[in-house]
């Protein structure tokens, strides 16, 4: 008798745990799961003839229908037309599902015969699904593959009405949904109830017993392929009570619930049909043919009492949290908040949530009208009378914002002033809502333009007087929702963090329900959703080249330090130069600030080595005058291209087409170093100048001071040098010093501003200097060109005819023999020099002083934006290569020349072969100082400047070379045959040799590698070196590391070695296929290399007896890495695939175990031996409800854990898959408790003691 009682009790216990899915499929379970009825008979029986399903067409399924009928009747649609459903093509199969969700995606697969779930990858299930029916040993069914946030999500679209009523879309804060990254339904990574879209894949014969969908959710169900048979039981009080008793009876497999319920209907769904199951309906499903179904679950506002009742049934029947609606009560709180916010315009969300989800307390003031982001609209979409109304309202600025806000939080005011304030606020809110409705394109199809409001009696007193009517279903449901949330104890209220004051929310909801108690149901059925998120303002995306706003007065002058508001644009990368193409150096102060390099991330700057040398205008830039973008690609000819290309002034920052300029008093000076940059004619004519730094590099430019090679200035000097060499061959030797200019000076001396250096000049970058001295002959030739360039530049500064005559005389003397090359070289040098440095007090140049032919020649030399960018990147790359090669070959150290005063800069020097020029000290205007003193001795500013000694050279400094990871090209594959001495190939092919090598030890393989080159490569095949053991190796040398990398092992043992962090980092960066790593006995400093984003996805990790590894270090080891590379957005732990973890001898606590539960969902073998802080509570934590380790744990080693007692064995009973428990040498665990554990588990799983306190499952 006693045995019978125990047996019955145990059977019931077994059945209860069917929700937990932790048991083995033992013989006892198989016996319990045998059905007591014939499923084939139930499919063909005609007894289930209830008439509950309503047949509809998609066009009739509208939001107005939902308001009228409340979604309480099952609906069947023969086609998807009119529903708004989007489905894949007809040839879509489960193999395509695998491709879109990932072949490694783990899914819960239900064994139909035992009603137990097992884990399979999608690849495994698809292989089973495609197996012929006769070859399937078991029936497997996938009913819980949620595919939101996968590629499959874009292929399947829900019915339109479902989107309109779903609480997830309309109640849950939007910014939380946008933060969801994890595609699986791991509760720890879930940001919202992720139950919107499911894929159900069933083979013929699958059966799911009677159930109610979790949380009382309603279900939409589209049969894409195959068919289904449903048994439906209506959710009457009697049926729900019967269903609850049936669940608790333990006889589900013996009783077909449809035979005992009040009414049951069997209905067969065919391919292409869509089914809607309301909340609370009890149903069972049979699959007559292999099927593929798409569906989803929703909670809505029209059947809330039934949803709450189903949730209570789940509480009483103790359904596992894994199979329940996630964040159920949190969702209920957000539902109340959204209704209160919509009806009273008062939000109970915290400020951060209001800002993120774009809900703000819309105060009836002018400021709120202009600042509310979700009320932004285009004025063009508004009617004329609305604009007039807006104008009347805006005439008087609102001064009562503070008063109205206080009125909002207080009781109603009965005074005359308060009434006037309410009236003004009402008008303003009506205007806002009207304008926002006109601009809300997404709501045009279902939202009426005359959107009613809630009355003034609501908690927010500044609302319009029109009433939003609620349906009777919504009123009844919201009332039940308030009562339910009030009745919950404090520890079960589950108030989300986004709700600021839950009690105030409940009070406001009660007030709203009182106000709407007498709502007219006919007026409420309007087809308009009451709660709806405001439309987000669309971000301005540049499609083609959008037009900017045209300035009303383009002739308005701006100061030199002020940018034009409509035309200023930040330049963007050219993406072609060497700087743009390289990676971060990781060593500059910008890199050290970046979060991925461990910094705080405050500077928000790119790496110094990646700062573009030729940034271009963004594609959104437009002309200030005409509002058009650049059109140089549409025309032919250099002159026409220049007139229609955008040019940005380096002084006033105006972006303009040269052809749009009306003033032609003076010509603009083009900056050859920066695309689309010049000094516009307006600034040039007015004599304005900007900072030398801006003129050197143009607006919005940052330069990397330690960039290898220099800018095009150096390249341009090289080209000038080559031209100069050709010129000098045609020239005769002439005097080095020309005649002196007469002593009479002009009244105005503009050269003072030239010679006197500005304070900003200190920011101008100095180029590299080398020890090689300049060639005197080449230097003499350079003086001739600089001499002419200076004179041409100064000609514009002299205003009197005498001054011009003197300058022309000197110029004619220099150019005694005219030459075409020099004629072209001089204007080029002049343009480049003026683009770098212009005279602060230079007067306007006269149009007649320069022939038109020279202007044409100069304009022909201006290239378009794209051509210049290509030229810049090409020449820079060549320069960098030349610089690096010369440094590598000659090993010259740069010598830094530092001027002793502000008047000096480094001069230019060139090498003897004429291939390279570098800067020595020169004058600010680009003229060599010696030549300047010889030409214009009277222009010297002060004796102090004249008597300056030559600059001294500082000691040589080592040049910092670039740090790049050099990836060698892939080596050729190993030969397939062994070449012999006579040139023939050996008869045995490579694969035969590989089979022989597989029998050799590693020591023998190393001997074979010495035979010949071919064997050397064959013996390094990674198939022969899956495991490498360096256990207790005294020293790890670089040669050993290279050998490991060459062999690419899957298992590496580095235990009890002195490997350093740098060595381990170098290894794991180059072993992507590494799966098993043993670092026991190493130091934490070395093990910390695993915290990098480059760590491979290990399966086994052994960190036993690691010195210094505690809870804080475990947190760093298990947390997601912080040094993600650009574009790497995976925020999961790099140890998420760990199945075996050995932590023996570590000083860790329960804090580390919580991290393991969170970040190691596949953990199967855990070694905590010799961990003195592990207690019974630790085991309780590992086996708690909802933890992944409760399902996955197979082996547990707790030997020598002195704080573990007999109580831990009761916790191990929760683990359905546990196979080995090692409690040896645990002082507080008795042998009798182990024997009792074996006896209690014998009904489910047979355990035995192979040694004392070593419990092992008997196979």
Curated annotation (Swiss-Prot):
Domain JmjC: from-to ranges: 147-315
Compartments it resides in: Nucleus, Nucleolus; Nucleus; Chromosome
Binding residue positions for Fe cation: 211, 213, 283
Residue span of region Disordered: 388-463, 536-562, 729-958
Gene3D superfamilies registered for this protein in UniProt: 1.20.1280.50, 1.20.58.1360, Cupin (2.60.120.650), Ribonuclease Inhibitor (3.80.10.10), Zinc/RING finger domain, C3HC4 (zinc finger) (3.30.40.10)
Entry's Gene Ontology BP terms: chromatin remodeling; regulation of transcription by RNA polymerase II
Database matches in InterPro entries: F-box_dom (IPR001810), JHD (IPR041070), JHDM1_Histone_Demethylase (IPR050690), JmjC_dom (IPR003347), Leu-rich_rpt_Cys-con_subtyp (IPR006553), LRR_dom_sf (IPR032675), Znf_CXXC (IPR002857), Znf_FYVE_PHD (IPR011011)
Residues in PHD-type zinc fingers: 620-686
Pfam families xref list: F-box-like, JHD, JmjC, PHD_4, zf-CXXC
Skewed-composition ranges (Polar residues): 403-413, 426-437, 835-848, 878-889
Keyword RNA-binding: yes
The protein's Enzyme Commission number: 1.14.11.27
Annotated cofactor note: Binds 1 Fe(2+) ion per subunit.
Required co-factors: Fe(2+)
The keyword Transcription regulation is assigned to this record: yes
Biased composition (Basic and acidic residues): 388-402, 414-423, 729-763, 771-790, 864-877, 890-908
Main location: nucleus
Means of activity regulation: Histone demethylase activity is inhibited by fumarate.
Domain notes: The CXXC zinc finger mediates binding to DNA containing unmethylated cytidine-phosphate-guanosine (CpG) dinucleotides.
Protein name: Lysine-specific demethylase 2B
Organism name: Xenopus laevis
Classification lineage: Eukaryota, Metazoa, Chordata, Craniata, Vertebrata
């Amino acid at each position: 008798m006693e045995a019978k009682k125990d047996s019955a009790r145990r059977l019931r216990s077994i059945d209860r745990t069917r929700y937990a899915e932790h048991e083995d499929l033992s013989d006892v379970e198989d016996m319990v799961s045998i059905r007591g009825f014939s499923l084939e008979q139930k499919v063909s029986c005609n007894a289930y003839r209830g008439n509950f399903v309503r047949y509809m067409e998609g066009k009739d399924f509208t939001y107005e229908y939902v308001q009228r009928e409340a979604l309480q009747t099952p609906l069947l649609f023969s086609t998807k037309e009119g529903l708004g459903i989007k489905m894949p093509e007809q040839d879509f199969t489960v193999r395509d599902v695998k491709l879109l969700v990932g072949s490694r995606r783990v899914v819960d697969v239900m064994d139909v015969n035992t009603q137990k779930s097992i884990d399979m990858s999608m690849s495994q299930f698809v292989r089973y699904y495609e197996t012929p029916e006769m070859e399937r040993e078991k029936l497997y069914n996938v009913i819980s593959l949620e595919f939101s946030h996968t590629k499959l999500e874009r292929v399947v679209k829900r019915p339109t009405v479902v989107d309109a009523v779903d609480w997830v879309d309309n109640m849950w804060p939007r910014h939380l949904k946008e933060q969801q990254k994890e595609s699986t339904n791991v509760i720890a990574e879930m940001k919202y109830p992720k139950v919107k879209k499911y894929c159900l894949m069933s083979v013929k014969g699958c059966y799911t017993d009677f159930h109610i969908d979790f949380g009382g959710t309603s279900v939409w169900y589209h049969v894409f392929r195959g068919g289904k048979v449903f048994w439906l039981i209506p959710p009457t009080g009697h049926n729900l009570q019967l269903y609850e008793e049936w669940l608790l009876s333990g006889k589900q497999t013996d009783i077909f619930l449809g035979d005992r319920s009040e009414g049951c209907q069997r209905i067969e769904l065919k391919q292409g049909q869509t089914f809607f199951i309301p909340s609370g309906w009890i149903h069972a499903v049979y699959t007559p043919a292999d099927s593929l179904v798409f569906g989803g679950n929703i909670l809505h506002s029209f059947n809330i009492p039934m949803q709450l009742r189903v949730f209570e049934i789940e509480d009483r029947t103790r359904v596992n949290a894994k199979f329940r609606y996630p964040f159920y009560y949190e969702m209920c709180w957000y539902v109340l908040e959204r209704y209160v916010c919509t009806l009273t315009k008062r939000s109970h969300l915290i400020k951060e949530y209001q800002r993120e989800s774009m809900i703000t307390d819309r105060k009836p003031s002018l400021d709120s009208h202009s600042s509310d982001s979700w009320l932004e609209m285009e004025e063009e979409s508004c009617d004329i009378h609305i604009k007039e109304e807006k104008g009347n309202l805006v005439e008087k600025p609102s001064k009562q914002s503070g008063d109205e806000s206080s009125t909002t939080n207080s009781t109603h005011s009965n005074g005359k002033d308060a009434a006037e304030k309410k009236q003004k606020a009402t008008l303003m809110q009506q205007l806002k809502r009207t304008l926002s409705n006109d601009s809300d394109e997404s709501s045009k199809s279902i939202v009426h333009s005359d959107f009613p409001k809630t009355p003034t009696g609501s908690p927010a007193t500044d609302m319009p007087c029109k009433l939003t009517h609620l349906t009777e279903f919504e009123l009844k449901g919201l009332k039940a929702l308030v009562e339910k949330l009030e009745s919950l104890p404090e520890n079960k209220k589950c108030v989300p963090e986004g709700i600021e004051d839950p009690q105030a929310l409940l009070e406001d909801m009660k007030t709203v329900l009182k106000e709407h108690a007498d709502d007219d149901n006919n007026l409420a059925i309007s087809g308009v959703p009451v709660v709806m998120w405001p439309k987000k303002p669309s971000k301005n995306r540049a499609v083609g080249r959008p037009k900017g706003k045209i300035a009303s007065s383009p002739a308005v002058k701006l100061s030199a330090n002020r940018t034009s508001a409509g035309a200023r644009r930040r330049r963007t990368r050219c993406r072609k130069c060497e700087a743009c193409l390289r990676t971060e150096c990781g060593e500059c102060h910008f890199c050290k600030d970046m979060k991925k390099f461990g910094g705080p991330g405050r500077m928000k700057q790119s790496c110094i080595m990646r700062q573009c040398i030729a940034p271009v205008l963004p594609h959104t830039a437009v002309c200030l005058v005409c509002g058009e973008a650049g059109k140089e690609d549409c025309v032919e000819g250099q002159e026409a291209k220049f007139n229609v290309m955008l040019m940005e002034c380096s002084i006033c920052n105006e972006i303009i087409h040269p052809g749009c300029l009306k003033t032609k008093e003076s010509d603009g000076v083009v900056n050859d170093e920066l695309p689309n940059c010049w000094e516009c004619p307006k600034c040039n004519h007015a004599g304005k100048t900007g900072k030398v730094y801006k003129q050197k590099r143009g607006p919005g430019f940052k330069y990397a001071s330690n960039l290898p090679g220099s800018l095009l200035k150096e390249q341009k000097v090289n080209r000038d040098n080559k031209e100069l060499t050709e010129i000098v061959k045609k020239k005769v030797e002439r005097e080095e010093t020309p005649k002196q200019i007469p002593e009479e000076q002009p009244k105005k001396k503009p050269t003072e501003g030239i010679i006197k250096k500005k304070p900003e000049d200190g920011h101008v970058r100095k180029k590299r200097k080398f020890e090689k001295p300049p060639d005197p002959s080449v230097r003499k030739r350079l003086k001739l060109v600089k001499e002419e360039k200076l004179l041409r530049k100064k000609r514009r500064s002299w205003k009197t005819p005498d001054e011009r005559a003197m300058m022309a005389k000197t110029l004619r003397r220099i150019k005694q023999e005219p030459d075409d090359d020099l004629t072209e070289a001089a204007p080029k040098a002049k343009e480049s020099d003026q683009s770098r440095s212009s005279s602060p007090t230079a007067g306007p140049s006269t149009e007649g002083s320069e022939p038109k032919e020279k202007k044409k020649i100069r304009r022909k030399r201006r290239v378009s934006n794209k051509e210049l960018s290509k030229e810049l990147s090409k020449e820079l790359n060549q320069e960098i290569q030349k610089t690096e090669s010369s440094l590598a070959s000659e090993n010259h150290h740069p010598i830094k020349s530092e001027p002793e005063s502000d008047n000096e800069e480094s001069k230019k020097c060139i090498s003897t072969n004429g291939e390279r020029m570098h800067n020595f000290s020169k004058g600010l205007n680009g003229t060599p100082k010696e030549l300047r003193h010889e030409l214009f001795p009277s222009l010297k500013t002060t004796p102090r400047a004249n008597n300056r000694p030559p600059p001294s050279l500082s000691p040589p400094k080592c040049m910092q070379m670039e740090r790049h990871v050099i990836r060698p090209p892939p080596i050729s594959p190993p030969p397939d045959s062994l070449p012999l001495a006579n040139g023939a190939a050996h008869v045995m092919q490579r694969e035969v040799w590989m089979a022989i090598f597989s029998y050799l030890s590693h020591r023998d393989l190393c001997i074979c590698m010495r035979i010949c080159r071919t064997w050397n490569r064959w013996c390094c095949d990674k198939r022969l070196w899956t495991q490498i053991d360096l256990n207790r190796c005294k020293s790890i040398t670089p040669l050993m590391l290279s050998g490991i990398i060459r062999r690419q092992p899957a298992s590496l043992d580095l235990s009890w070695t002195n490997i350093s962090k740098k060595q381990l980092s170098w290894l794991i960066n180059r072993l992507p296929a590494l799966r098993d790593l043993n670092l026991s006995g190493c130091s934490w400093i070395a093990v910390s290399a695993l915290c990098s984003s480059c760590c491979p996805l290990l399966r086994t990790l052994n960190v036993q007896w690691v010195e210094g590894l505690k809870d804080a270090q475990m947190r760093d080891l298990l947390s997601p890495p912080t040094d993600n590379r650009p574009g790497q957005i995976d925020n999961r732990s790099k140890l998420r695939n760990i199945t075996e973890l050995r932590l023996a001898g570590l000083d860790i606590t329960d804090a580390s175990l919580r991290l393991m539960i969170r970040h190691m969902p596949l953990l199967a073998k855990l070694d905590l031996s010799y961990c003195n802080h592990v207690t019974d509570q630790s085991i309780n934590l590992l086996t708690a409800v909802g933890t992944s380790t409760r399902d996955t744990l197979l082996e547990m080693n707790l030997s020598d854990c002195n704080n573990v007692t007999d109580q831990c064995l009761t916790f191990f009973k929760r683990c359905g898959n546990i196979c080995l428990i090692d409690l040896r040498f645990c002082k507080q665990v008795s042998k009798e408790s182990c024997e009792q554990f074996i006896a209690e588990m014998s009904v489910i799983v047979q355990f035995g003691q192979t040694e004392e306190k070593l419990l092992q499952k008997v196979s």
